[in-house]
């Protein structure tokens, strides 16, 4: 209706016809035109933002936070003693479902660091407890109090039940001395191609509760790993994102 009215006015003006509008009517008309323009612009902007949000949401993998390869294990989520089906890969054992990916990841890492080997895989709760206690004792032998020793050890070694090694989904890799930072960064970069992520990266210890470890990798699946790398997420953050999307 407004568009037709404006066209009619324009036609009459061009035709030489003089039209008189009361000031109040003219003011209302111009105000209506201005508001309509603003609404149209706002609608376009809102539509654009909505499209961006939808695009961002659609980037999130269509997976469940409860998937076996996304099990979250940390001090707030202790792992029950479970014995997964294991397969030997080199000198370690891993969950049989990730054995082939582990072999491929190791082979790729060896193209960067030929001396690369796997030094740890599945570890039972009892083995984790023994490792933990040994390290606490070693710190106490340096003169630390028990509390100080526990605090120091827990920055890199998980308490029994909080270690991902119990799942068979975590591996520790070696890196030849002297080239640790350079080689470790390259290996971490290619890890998602095989479904692995560097579990405890720099700058995330306030979330993971563990200091930076360039050797500890966790299998989460290729799609999940690539998304986590792209968005700089650790597993705790990724799980929270998935759970929010599931609500």
Language-model-derived ranges and their functions:
Residues 1-247:
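Extracytoplasmic cell-surface/polysaccharide-interacting catalytic and binding patches
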């Amino acid at each position: 209706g407004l568009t037709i009215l404006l066209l009619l006015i324009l036609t009459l003006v061009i035709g030489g016809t003089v039209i008189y509008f009361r000031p109040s009517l003219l003011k209302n008309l111009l105000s209506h035109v201005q508001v309509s323009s603003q609404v149209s612009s706002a609608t376009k902007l809102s539509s654009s933002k909505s499209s961006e949000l939808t695009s961002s949401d659609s980037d999130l993998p269509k997976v469940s936070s409860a998937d076996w390869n996304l099990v979250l294990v940390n001090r707030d989520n202790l792992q029950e003693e479970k014995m997964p089906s294991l397969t030997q890969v080199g000198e370690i054992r891993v969950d049989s479902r990730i054995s082939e990916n582990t072999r491929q990841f190791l082979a790729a890492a060896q193209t960067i660091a030929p001396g690369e080997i796997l030094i740890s895989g599945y570890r039972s709760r009892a083995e984790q407890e023994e490792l933990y206690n040994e390290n606490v004792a070693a710190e106490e032998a340096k003169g630390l109090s028990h509390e100080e020793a526990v605090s120091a050890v827990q920055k890199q070694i998980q308490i029994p039940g909080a270690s991902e090694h119990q799942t068979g989904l975590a591996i520790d890799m070696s890196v030849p001395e002297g080239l640790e930072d350079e080689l470790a960064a390259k290996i971490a970069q290619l890890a998602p191609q095989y479904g692995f992520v560097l579990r405890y990266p720099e700058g995330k210890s306030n979330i993971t509760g563990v200091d930076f470890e360039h050797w500890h990798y966790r299998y989460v699946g290729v799609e999940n790993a690539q998304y986590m790398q792209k968005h700089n997420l650790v597993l705790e953050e990724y799980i929270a994102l998935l759970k929010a999307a599931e609500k």
